């Protein structure tokens, strides 16, 4: 890879981070029903169009195409791109948006890209923190979608994030509880996933000793 290609790759990585965080901010702000919701959706379109370009660019220049799809990070990008294309086709043919909940589900798929941030840092403590943050964040987004409008205690993203965090960390104050079966399942699987991750980390640490 020559100097020009390395510079382009670096620029792509920086833009990828910027657009990923745009999606994160967009989702959080959307839970407060802002008057600029349409603007957020337009910004999301720009971000996801960049992700689509980035995915095609990476796939085009990789030598081993089969190995490309064995990488979990590329699979995440593929899911995001396919979901975006399907949603765009639906909007084009129906001439109308499908609703904020569908848009937020698409945003959550994009949030899976947070997982890729772990590649940027080799510090194990920071990797563990980013992993936990990713689990809590995505679970919070799902909780907000299924519980908002049903659960009077969950009115915005912060309420959902607070509830998810204390549930996953098993603190569980009990001041906020899920009201829907979907919400309960999300918390159950999130806690089980978190605990299984702790067990795996402990097993690796013991083997290392």
Swiss-Prot record:
Matches recorded under SUPFAM superfamilies: Voltage-gated potassium channels
Example of a GO cellular component annotation carried by this entry: voltage-gated potassium channel complex
Entry keyword DNA damage: no
Major place of residence: membrane
GO molecular function: voltage-gated potassium channel activity
Motif range (Selectivity filter): 170-175
Side of membrane Cytoplasmic, spans: 1-10, 60-71, 118-125, 203-209
InterPro entries the UniProt entry points to: Hyp-activated_K+_channel (IPR053681), Ion_trans_dom (IPR005821), VG_K_chnl (IPR028325), Volt_channel_dom_sf (IPR027359)
Protein topology in the membrane: Multi-pass membrane protein
Extracellular side, ranges: 32-38, 93-96, 147-181
Pfam families, A to Z: Ion_trans
Transport listed as a keyword: yes
Record's keyword terms, sorted: Cell membrane, Ion channel, Ion transport, Membrane, Potassium, Potassium channel, Potassium transport, Transmembrane, Transmembrane helix, Transport, Voltage-gated channel
Cellular localization per UniProt: Cell membrane
Extra remark: Inhibited by barium.
Stored NCBIfam families: K_channel_Meth (NF040645)
UniProt remark on domains: The segment S4 is probably the voltage-sensor and is characterized by a series of positively charged amino acids.
Function: Voltage-gated potassium-selective channel opened by hyperpolarization.
Name used for this protein in its record: Hyperpolarization-activated voltage-gated potassium channel
């Amino acid at each position: 890879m020559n100097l020009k290609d390395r510079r382009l790759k670096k620029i792509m990585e920086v833009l990828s981070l910027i657009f990923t965080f745009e999606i994160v901010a967009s989702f959080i702000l959307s839970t407060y029903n802002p008057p600029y919701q349409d603007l957020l959706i337009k910004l999301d379109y720009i971000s996801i169009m960049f992700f689509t370009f980035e995915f095609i660019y990476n796939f085009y220049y990789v030598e081993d195409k089969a190995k490309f799809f064995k990488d979990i990070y590329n699979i995440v990008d593929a899911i995001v791109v396919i979901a975006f294309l399907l949603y765009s086709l639906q909007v084009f043919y129906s001439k109308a948006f499908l609703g904020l909940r569908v848009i937020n589900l698409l945003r959550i798929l994009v949030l899976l890209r947070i997982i890729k941030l772990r590649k940027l840092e080799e510090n194990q403590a920071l990797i563990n923190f980013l992993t936990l943050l990713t689990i809590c964040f995505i679970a919070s987004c799902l909780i907000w979608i299924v519980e908002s409008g049903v659960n009077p205690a969950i009115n915005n993203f912060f309420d959902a994030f607070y509830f998810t965090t204390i549930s996953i960390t098993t603190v569980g104050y009990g001041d906020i509880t899920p009201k829907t079966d979907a919400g309960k399942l999300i918390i159950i699987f999130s806690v089980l996933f978190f605990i299984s991750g702790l067990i795996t980390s402990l097993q690796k640490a013991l083997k290392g000793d």
